[in-house]
Amino acid sequence: IHEQQVLLCRRAIEPRHGYWTLPAGFMENGETTEQAALRETYEEAYASPELGPLFSVCNLPRGNQVHLFYLAQMTLAEYGSGPESLEVELYDEHDIPWDDIAFGTVTQTLKRFFEDRKKGVNQLHHIDF
C-alpha cells in the first residue's frame, strides 16, 4: 500500500501469465511467512515495504494450499519489474483491472481490503475456496 493505492504485478510466468496479482509466492526452506512475504515483494516488484499485520488467510483445500496476505506499507513509491513481473503499478481501487486479476484469492483479498478501508476497520479475514 502506498497512500491510497495498492501495488500489483502483471505476471511474467505461468500460471496466469499476463494477469495481475499482489506480490506473492512460495516460502523457501527456513523462512517465516513474514520473511517470505518481504522477499517475494522485493523479487517481484523491487519494493521494500514495512510489513504490517496478516490480513487474509485463504484456504484452498483442492489445491493443497493456504495463501496468506499481509498488509504492507510503502513509505516511498519505489518499485520496478522483477524477473517474474511484466510490469508493476500502483492502482487506485477504481482503476484496478478487475477482469484481469490472476487468482480468486487476490480478488477476494483486494475486495475485503477496500471494504474494510471504507468502514475504517482492520480485521483478519478467513476465506475458504
Where are these regions (language model features)?
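N-terminal strand-loop-strand
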Residues: 1-21, 49, 53
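Short hydrophobic "strand-cap" motifs at the C-terminus of beta-strands
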Residues: 24
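Unchanged
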Residues: 27-50, 54-112, 116, 120-129
